[in-house]
Amino acid sequence: MLQATSKRNAKEIIEDMILYYGTYESKSKDKVNDLLEELEDVDSSKAKQWDEIMKYWQTNHEKLEINNDVLPDGLDKSDKLCIVVLGYQLNDDGTMQDELIGRLKVALDSANKYPNAYVACTGGGTAKDNSNVTEADQMAQWLIDNGLNKDRLIIENKSSSTVENAKFTYNILRKKYIDIDKIAIVTSDYHIERGSLLYKAQLVLSAAKNNDKSIQIVSNAAYQAHKDSEPFLWQAGGLCEILGDVKLANKIYDEKYTKPKL
């Protein structure tokens, strides 16, 4: 007597999607679509969420426009927009590296262009020899010192990674700034693609979990760091972190994961 084949759970299917697209990029689109159909049969709610995330990932990777130095024209001019500035490793003594100051200059120019927008500074304590400072607090003080009204600032100073940046920023916005429904990402040019993707995924999943409206990523502005692009696989690793599979994420970062067969 033949036994019915047991269905895989949603997490297994989602991880497969991440691995296929992270490994094969556009060559895996048909496989990703098949996996979305499989996910639909298992959990239609998660299928809807991950369909949105995967479509964003594909478009973000293939058609992303990066705006250097300042946010573009045409964004919402109200206080429903939040400019989110991603932090960067502090010097051992707690001072900011030039790259982080470069991101802040882009953020300040963007904030001056959109004077009603909030500005969120993100990043926890990363100074080896100074546990009293955080990236976000240092960033906020620099912006105040350079003319930004402190009432426009939102500070997320607990995170230790881009994944946590996204999660904790969402929590603050939904608890204290419920009218904000759009964000624009400010970070270094090589980090825009991954940062935007991880924020998108976290925003979609958090909104679904809390039965809340989703906050949309509407644009970006980049500090030109003149560094090599981040490995594409890191985006897959970040998504696995968001799923809660840190072990698989680390294997992806180290390129020691088992590649799926296309």
Where are the regions a protein language model picked out?
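Short, solvent-exposed amphipathic alpha-helices that sit
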Residues: 102-110, 131-143, 194-205
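Short phosphate-binding loop-to-helix
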Residues: 157-170
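A non-catalytic structural micro-motif
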Residues: 118-120, 140-158, 204-222
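Extended hydrophobic blocks
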Residues: 1-82, 89, 167-262
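Histidine-anchored nucleotide/phosphate-binding helix
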Residues: 97-116, 169
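Short loop/turn segments at strand-loop or loop-helix junctions that form parts
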Residues: 83-89, 121-124
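Surface-exposed cleft-lining segments at the edges of enzyme active sites
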Residues: 89-96, 128-129, 152-155
